[in-house]
């Protein structure tokens, strides 16, 4: 049986009676909207400077920078969650959060296999690199990460819950890539 998302509950219990600063939607140099200065190490350092206690790395359709994020967060005393901002077949962006790096990587592999073979063109859409904790580039993702995977909102949510994760709709206040902009409503459940 997989570990559940109980790690969040433990963090909140320790923070009872005080304000807990968290950021659950962060992109790194892996996402084409990011740049090379946004390594997991640099992100964790900035989060620590700002007093953030809980953070989730949620690159587009991939978790390949989550291992470096885990190490960087441990160095700074930040409780990490490991995630993905998945793009569904309806073009909704959904945050998928996990307490374990391995589970986020597993979902990332499934998403990548379900994405169309639209290749990234770094000169036009930006780099998509994953790095180690020393900021050495380990590789570059070939497919363009900001495309829809062959997962419906309901199918993705079911899979994330099956893996012991947490599902959060992204961009709830935006006119694009949100549940309401794409579906016209927020589904039950």
Put a short name on every predicted segment.
Residues 1-2, 14:
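Basic polycationic patches enriched in arginine
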Residues 7, 12-90, 183-186:
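An N-terminally biased module of ancient metal coordination in phosphate/nucleic-acid-related enzymes
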Residues 14-15, 19, 72-189:
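Extended substrate/RNA-proximal surfaces in nucleic-acid metabolism proteins
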């Amino acid at each position: 049986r997989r570990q559940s998302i109980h790690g969040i509950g433990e963090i909140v219990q320790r923070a009872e009676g005080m304000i807990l600063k968290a950021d659950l939607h962060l992109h790194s140099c892996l996402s084409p909207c990011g740049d090379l200065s946004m390594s997991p190490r640099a992100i964790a350092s900035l989060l620590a400077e700002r007093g953030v206690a809980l953070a989730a790395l949620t690159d587009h359709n991939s978790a390949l920078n989550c291992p470096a994020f885990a190490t960087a967060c441990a160095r700074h005393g930040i409780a990490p969650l490991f995630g993905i901002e998945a793009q569904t077949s309806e073009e909704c962006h959904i945050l998928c959060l996990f307490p374990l790096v391995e589970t986020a990587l597993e979902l990332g592999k499934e998403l990548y296999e379900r994405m169309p073979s639209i290749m990234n063109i770094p000169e036009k859409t930006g780099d998509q690199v994953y790095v180690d904790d020393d900021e050495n580039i380990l590789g570059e993702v070939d497919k363009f990460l900001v495309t829809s995977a062959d997962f419906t909102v309901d199918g993705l949510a079911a899979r994330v819950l099956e893996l012991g994760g947490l599902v959060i709709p992204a961009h709830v206040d935006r006119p694009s890539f949100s549940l309401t902009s794409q579906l016209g409503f927020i589904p039950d459940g």
